Amino acid sequence: MTAPHTSANDRVIIFDTTLRDGEQCPGATMTFEEKLEVASLLDSMGVDVIEAGFPIASDGDFEAVHEIAKRAKNAVICGLSRAGAKDIDRCAEAIKPAKQGRIHTFLSTSPVHMKYKLQMDAAQVYELVISSVTRARNHTDNVEWSSEDGTRTEFDFLCKCVEAAIKAGASTINIPDTVGYSVPEEYYDLFKRVRENVPNSDKAIFSVHCHDDLGMAVANSLAGIRGGARQIECTVNGIGERAGNTALEEVVMAMKVRNDKLPYWNKIDTTMLTRASKVVSAATSFPVQYNKAIVGRNAFAHESGIHQDGMLKNAETYEIMLPESVGVKQTSLVMGKHSGRHAFIHKLEEMGYKLGQNQLEDAFVRFKALADRKKDIYDEDIEALVDLEIAQSHDRIKLVSLTVIAGTHGPQRATMKLDVDGQTKIEEAEGNGPVDAVFNCIKALVPHVAKLELYQVHAVTEGTDAQAEVSVRLSHEGRSVTSRASDPDTLVASAKAYLGALNKIVMKRQRDMAAPAAAAS
């Protein structure tokens, strides 16, 4: 927890929108179960407000928000809504089970948005601000209003809309830098001036929401806080549309490490930041770049001889924060084929995993199989293995075995055995290379029209026996799904990743088919 100050005026509310704005990032779609896991972790680590989704967008989004609202223990559960009555009412229904619920309604206010997107004039927009907030306020006393494209909105009109929204009952006012256009000095000045010019500004909490199109989302968010905002809207790993959103882990640690210049506090348990990063990365199949601040693999790694020498003498020579403060251990416990079940369970608990008995047994079997093929097992290996086990626990299509014949001459041929809904299927296929042969096998065993958009491979750890981690993105009916899998055998990892994406498509189709039936009953 980052709380050296006790003044309520210095407290910053952390509003996480990983499950809403983050999931809007192309290819970052999460399953229902993955959303519940991410929400549970965010709740546990001290996030104040979880924006769980956009209920009107789909039945799946509604169900996820509704279920998260049921399960949340501490966080306010928020749903996003446009300004229309149907949107607001649907959002209210979704958050109804929450101990603390919030409706977040928004409306564009910039000249370019009003003219081309809304095709409305300023007077119409102003009236809609009032009516939408009033309707939301009839459902809950916790209403947030956002001025979409607020940083490109004419200042006087922005102040007029903010004043009206507060008067209509909004307790939080968000002025987002929707297109990532602002610079810190400008964003600081905007909040300072709005708060000075809106007569009832003291009756609401002001919020920042920044995008990273110019690489300044974190800097702008902190500038907005200095300008008087007291809520930061952010996502784990900074995922989001286009270049992404403000990274939760970065703003939280900036306030903690540089509290001398940023004298604010929040309730986040920073030791859970790395775990949150890994869970979101696994759920979205978006790898975290190695040099990512705070949670990147190299954030606490030192290879230069000069740096290593300094670190050995005193860690403060090159580290401005302790690795343990963000949940990173300085040393990795190396495990191998002689490690037993007890040691494995202890290691999982140490790493923050909580598995069911069946998942635990399956993960241990996978671990022992990996240990027989790999000399040393590192934390990264175990994370990759367990994340795959969690992802596959709901799969309807599972890989049983794979044999590939490849070489410099002759065709590349793959033979694959799959378990499809409990039924074993075997097929052989050729391809232009071993990976193509593997994917052709899958297409023969499970006929589908999904298109391969992305295929990437990188090593989980170092060495010739390192596990390969493969990312596969498939597009189906205008929707992209991404999956990752790891294995010492690159071709096996490729098959698992492709099947993982295919399983997501199957689960999505199954949920879409179930929704009308549930509504009819």
Swiss-Prot record:
EC number(s) in its UniProt entry? 2.3.3.13
* Pyruvate carboxyltransferase domain ranges (all copies): 12-274
**Keywords per UniProt:** Amino-acid biosynthesis, Branched-chain amino acid biosynthesis, Cytoplasm, Leucine biosynthesis, Manganese, Metal-binding, Transferase
Q: Which BP terms does GO give this entry? A: L-leucine biosynthetic process
Cellular location(s)? Cytoplasm
Which principal EC class is assigned to this enzyme? transferase
Q: Quick one: where's region Regulatory domain? A: 398-521
The cofactors named for this UniProt entry are: Mn(2+)
Q: Please state the pathway this protein functions in, per its UniProt record.
A: Amino-acid biosynthesis; L-leucine biosynthesis; L-leucine from 3-methyl-2-oxobutanoate: step 1/4
Q: Name one Pfam family in it.
A: HMGL-like
Binding-site list for Mn(2+)? D21, H209, H211, N245
Cellular component terms (Gene Ontology): cytosol
> What molecular function terms (GO) are annotated for this protein?
2-isopropylmalate synthase activity; acetyl-CoA C-acetyltransferase activity; manganese ion binding
Query: SUPFAM superfamilies recorded for this chain?
Result: 2-isopropylmalate synthase LeuA, allosteric (dimerisation) domain (SSF110921), Aldolase (SSF51569)
Q: Which family is annotated?
A: Belongs to the alpha-IPM synthase/homocitrate synthase family. LeuA type 1 subfamily.
Per UniProt, subunit arrangement is: Homodimer.
Q: What is the recorded name of this protein?
A: 2-isopropylmalate synthase
Gene from which the chain derives? leuA
